[in-house]
Amino acid sequence: MSNELLWFIVFLVDFSALLLFYKFLGKLGLFAWVAMATVIANIQVVKVISLFGVSATLGNVLYASIFLATAILSENYTKRDAALAALIGFVSMVALPVLMTLSLLFKPGADDFSQEALQTLFGVVPRVVGGSAVAYIVSQFHDVWSYHFIKSKKPGTKMLWLRNNGSTLVSQLLDSLIFATIAFYGLYPTRVFWEIVLTTYLLKAACALLDTPFIYLAKYLYTHGHVRER
């Protein structure tokens, strides 16, 4: 099975799972999804794959689903709920390397076989961790703000696609630029640096455009009383 086909399958699985979290757990399900997706995406990003002829990291699809989760909260609930979800994701993102770094400080036993693998996955690279954290918090809060700004200018279900795509496409660009600049600028030739920015953004932008039916489904579930709030 090709990586490209797997990418589309993963997209459908991730975004469908997000809707199931929402349908059966309501608003709390979206909060849980943001925390879970943030942690898993930051583990997946360690793996580099070839996708559509370019090198890319895993985690882009799951990371993009976080923006859909906050968009659903912005659309069906309040700006405060969306901002809270973004903050939950940020805390999860920061907690993961901190807690795993502490775990790695323990001296492994004679029969241990996991230390090297854990070091590979969770060994802290300050620029990468810092870049991820700054990019996440800036892009997420911009996403929440811009969604509500567009909603105030273009309300109504017919403009839902514009609110979702308009806010996310700009926010994902901010995310890609900030992360790549902090994590990689000066480490690679200028051409390679911009290739990283471009390919990362294009994958995230593709997810943003493809997730439009999912936010309409989330709106339908909410307005027709199919969401089980906890």
Where do the model's predicted regions map?
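Membrane-embedded alpha-helical bundles of multi-pass transporters/translocases
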Residues: 123, 127, 131, 135, ...
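Transmembrane alpha-helix/helix-exit interface in multi-pass inner-membrane proteins
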Residues: 87-110, 132, 136-140, 144
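Membrane-interface interhelical connector segments
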Residues: 102-127
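Hydrophobic transmembrane alpha-helices
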Residues: 1-73, 80, 90
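Hydrophobic alpha-helical transmembrane segments
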Residues: 8, 31-32, 61, 86, ...
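A structural feature that tracks compact, well-ordered secondary-structure segments
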Residues: 168, 176-185
